Amino acid sequence: MGTSARWALWLLLALCWAPRDSGATASGKKAKCDSSQFQCTNGRCITLLWKCDGDEDCTDGSDEKNCVKKTCAESDFVCKNGQCVPNRWQCDGDPDCEDGSDESPEQCHMRTCRINEISCGARSTQCIPESWRCDGENDCDNGEDEENCGNITCSADEFTCSSGRCVSRNFVCNGQDDCDDGSDELDCAPPTCGAHEFQCRTSSCIPLSWVCDDDADCSDQSDESLEQCGRQPVIHTKCPTSEIQCGSGECIHKKWRCDGDPDCKDGSDEVNCPSRTCRPDQFECEDGSCIHGSRQCNGIRDCVDGSDEVNCKNVNQCLGPGKFKCRSGECIDITKVCDQEQDCRDWSDEPLKECHINECLVNNGGCSHICKDLVIGYECDCAAGFELIDRKTCGDIDECQNPGICSQICINLKGGYKCECSRGYQMDLATGVCKAVGKEPSLIFTNRRDIRKIGLERKEYIQLVEQLRNTVALDADIAAQKLFWADLSQKAIFSASIDDKVGRHFKMIDNVYNPAAIAVDWVYKTIYWTDAASKTISVATLDGTKRKFLFNSDLREPASIAVDPLSGFVYWSDWGEPAKIEKAGMNGFDRRPLVTEDIQWPNGITLDLVKSRLYWLDSKLHMLSSVDLNGQDRRIVLKSLEFLAHPLALTIFEDRVYWIDGENEAVYGANKFTGSELATLVNNLNDAQDIIIYHELVQPSGKNWCEEDMENGGCEYLCLPAPQINDHSPKYTCSCPNGYNLEENGRECQSTSTPVTYSETKDVNTTDILRTSGLVPGGINVTTAVSEVSVPPKGTSAAWAILPLLLLVMAAVGGYLMWRNWQHKNMKSMNFDNPVYLKTTEEDLSIDIGRHSASVGHTYPAISVVSTDDDLA
């Protein structure tokens, strides 16, 4: 053996015999507690926060030894027993001191209500926001806030219903019960239309120019009927080959045809279908749908009607405090244990050494809290707020892991928890709900030819914008008091002031071919929308002067969209095949899937920014679900064929979720955690499509980093927020119009050298090619389209910079190969001729976008992605 080989062998043996760090202590025993725990003298581990907290958590009391006397901070309230609690917890209706001194009448009666608050009476210690008085809800524990309120007086442009409710005068005698008691439709004269109007069979009036234009504007479609026009209306929609067209015009997936669930508005997908039968390995629900047989009686409602969990029997009959299970399998009554008679085949009910022995008398049975003596043996139990972690030791329960245990903020305490509210909200002590302080929140929703508003407290129901054509999408800039909506018939996005009594509205963005949804960025003052015809997601300034396609690939049926400018992310749903919900940076980077499983028709999505969750409606599964903003912690809120027959859009405020159902033509509300407390807010709608909450707390204020140091961030075209992935993420990036690339300075735009042909992502049956005109730097108008090809900047400086490093790496690799070849010649080897097959897969190109440190303004390096294949649906 050569000298080099012997040295290598000695080195190998030294490495093998070297002592390893296995976490052993000097005494050879493993440390039981980690860095976040305190080790008691008896070896037990407790959380470090429990040391010197005044409670003996170690059974030997070692956690309270050698403790420095604790003094409360200036921001704390000192309980009579010396305990410290935050000042804001004093007189909040919830005792936090162990002796209850923070809620003592002596302390709380001396309390003075703050500005914009009212007292609940001389005998009450409670203060509530002034805006909660006479809002229809008892917020004071004695109900004093709803006393002496008087009758609600409607304004001059409103009608007073028999119930006292106020509705818009435009709703009177319109053929719809808007009062919910029919009083707005009493004593109505036969409706007449003007000289330039057409009267539908339902008696409603539409402009004469809307008749026979192949777009049904009457709810009964009488303006496009064969009798009126002398021909059938021309349906312009052409469905992809993977979809079928309903009699009512819309497209649905082919696989939804004859599945027992009407998906078309007119139900034509379930006409002339063969009778359905379930396979032998399936269970047939009462509604006719089929589920796998293994899902029956599994404790989960898999059938929409819940019929799979009806008449289920518990196979384990040996449960409960009055039963004892023998080791031999029998189940006997607990009274037969230790009665000196054999009831179990194996005599396990009569163990000689265990009967009538109280193990709890010695060291509490080893239990850290409670020891319960049983007929045979014993069991440990814990005090409220704790749970067994090893059959003997009790640990704190983190109640904050339970969804909905607190309305907004949950603080886990030892043996309990504390609920708090976010800024701008105050807890209603009667319900535990964090209610908004300030103006009354309201729901605003589209009703095809108008936009309506209903107050959530006083239920005032009015018309905001009228004489519209076909409104399908809606959002608002609440701070600016502006509404934005998309009109399918006019292929445009409009805006209006919410307080405009004249009824003026303005066209902001044109050439929006089939808008599905819009989302307003209230911080950076842009608007995002999905287009179902061009299969794109676009962004534009609110005035419409600058716009571009943000995404134009891998979109099949883009639907709802929502933005969070505070974190720089945009979210959207796509009910194409496969259906999914995605998220990406609002600048078009860091695109990733959020929900891809158990999802079929995700129509509406909305963000709960307070709880950091995304909610969505699935019209096919008749389900309302939610996930956190990383796609984790998925929960089903509500599953209902009745209330979620064909849900279209939803919105969230406080502890309630509200949605529009197209089939029921109604607006519903429910608890956002449990799906309970279902309520109907509005009925008798006419093709309502979208809904939002209007309240200043829905759109929290944030900093517009594009206007922090220089106008528009120094960008020549669009300045868009970047996704805040970590502390080093840039705040914004510059973006160019379609057909232009960013220059190396990351701010200016230059035209691509090669002309680009643009066309929409389309099926082979589609004949029209959609194009749109966009304003580009220098005031040049170019015809742009859905696809975009980016050309990377040319240059060789980067290659010369890395050449020395490359040569060094090559030299090192060459030296290693020479050494291995020399070693191979000096070693005996054995060769096996068995072939080895490697599975290779073609991976998608992954591009890592470099980011610099925490500069406010920053741009991503240019990226080139060239696609030559059409994305056929």
Curated annotation (Swiss-Prot):
Give the record's subunit note.
Homooligomer. Binds to the extracellular matrix protein Reelin/RELN. Interacts with LRP8. Interacts with LDLRAP1. Interacts with SNX17. Interacts with DAB1. Interacts with PCSK9. Interacts with PAFAH1B3 and PAFAH1B2, the catalytic complex of (PAF-AH (I)) heterotetrameric enzyme; these interactions may modulate the Reelin pathway. Interacts with STX5; this interaction mediates VLDLR translocation from the endoplasmic reticulum to the plasma membrane. Interacts with CLU.
The residue ranges of the LDL-receptor class A domain are: 31-69, 70-110, 111-151, 152-190, 191-231, 237-275, 276-314, 316-355
Q: What CDD domains does the record tag this protein with?
A: EGF_CA, LDLa
| Entry GO terms, CC | apical part of cell; cell surface; clathrin-coated pit; extracellular space; glutamatergic synapse; membrane; perinuclear region of cytoplasm; plasma membrane
User: Which residue windows are transmembrane per the record?
Assistant: 798-819
Which one GO biological process term can you cite for this protein?
cellular response to glucose starvation
Q: Which residues lie on this side of the membrane: Extracellular?
A: 28-797
- LDL-receptor class B repeats: from-to residues: 439-480, 481-524, 525-567, 568-611, 612-654, 655-697
| Covalent link Glycyl lysine isopeptide (Lys-Gly) (interchain with G-Cter in ubiquitin), residues | K839
In which tissues or organs does this protein occur?
Answer: Abundant in soleus, gastrocnemicus, heart muscle, placenta, brain, lung and white fat. Less in aorta, ovary, kidney, spleen, adrenal gland and thymus.
Residues with glycosylation annotation = N151, N765, N781
Name of this protein = Very low-density lipoprotein receptor
Q: Does the keyword Disulfide bond apply?
A: yes
Renumbered to this chain, motif Endocytosis signal spans: 832-837
Which ranges of this chain reside in the Cytoplasmic compartment per its record?
Answer: 820-873
